Amino acid sequence: MGGHFWALIATWTFLCSIRVVLADESFEQELGLSAFPDVTKVNVSQDEYTRMMRTYLHTLRESMDNHSVPELQTFDAETITWHPKKKYVTRLGFSGVSMSSEMEIEQADLRILVSSFVDAPSPTIKIYQILSARRRRLLDEKVVYLSSTASKWCEFDVTSGVDSWLKGNRNLGIELQCAQCNNSVLQPLQATLSILVYTTPKRVRRSSPYNYEEGGRTDCINGEKRQKCCRHTMKVTFKDLKVPQISSIIQPKSYEAGFCKGRCPYNYNHATNHSRIQSLVHKLDRKAVPRVCCAPSKLAPLDVLRVDPYDYTKLNVEKWDNMKVLECACS
């Protein structure tokens, strides 16, 4: 009985693993990608990050028809200190971070270079904003994948902390905590803040060359009870999709994808002549032919900065086709 039970468990585990692999492959295929990198092996240097982030931002400026695009600013830690009584606590000082109140933060990442680590290859590191001598605020927490033979770069989201400095809170630095780490891991060889910031008042912007906020041709009108086919807003945040490989996307963290929904009454906003004919035939015989449906009629690509799937130390700027809905029609 016991042997049969464990055999069933082993079989179920094997089938589940196959299902996960197939799901990942399907996700790659649906996006038209050849591969995703192994996130446990990603190790992008600060020089490579800075170079390719600026290339990505330049690409955005060209594709967005001069709509506001942030600038990249980097600040190295001036001080790295260790808590005298707690070996698993390290403090980073960034007193040189100077920004005016007119600036606006898009994204702020703390990137640290940590030494090789044998004891626990995947410890959990917590990042805190220091508010006072006794108060801390958690900014980010993640499992990092270290190497037993080489130093590795790790990245953390500290946007809310840097934004609070911009709004007048005292800049007392950032604290790293890792109960599973030893001193060598929490003594970063290098620590850098990489900040995407709007240095001038930003104009209307979205991640496309179209200015939706001023009203697209098929954008939905707020307050309409029974909306006809129109474009609704839909913000997609990549980390919320719960697909491990998608964490290799560096930028954008999120984007406005949009979707189509609404009624398609007779002779309303047809996408093609075929949809007009289908609408007429449906009116004659509703059982034989379905009503036309609200669907995207114009799509746009998305510029993406992500880890090279074949060289985990490099970044690529890519254009992913058909990622954003621009207009909707009955089809």
List the predicted regions and their residue ranges:
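Cysteine-clustered segments with highest specificity for TGF-beta superfamily mature ligands
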Residues: L110-I112, R135-D219, Q278-V317
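Short coil/turn segments at secondary-structure boundaries
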Residues: S122-T124, L186-L189, T272-H274
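Helix N-cap / beta->alpha transition motif
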Residues: S95, D157-D163, T237-K239
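Short, well-ordered loop/turn elements at secondary-structure boundaries
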Residues: E106, G168-N169, S254
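N-terminal leader/pro-regions and domain N-caps
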Residues: G2-Q107, R111-K152, S184, D303-C330
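Eukaryotic basic, amphipathic alpha-helical target segments in cytosolic regions
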Residues: R19, M64, S116-V118, R135, ...
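Folded, disulfide-stabilized extracellular/luminal domains of secretory-pathway proteins
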Residues: R206-S331
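Intrinsically disordered regulatory linkers and targeting segments
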Residues: F14-R61, Y198-K242, P252
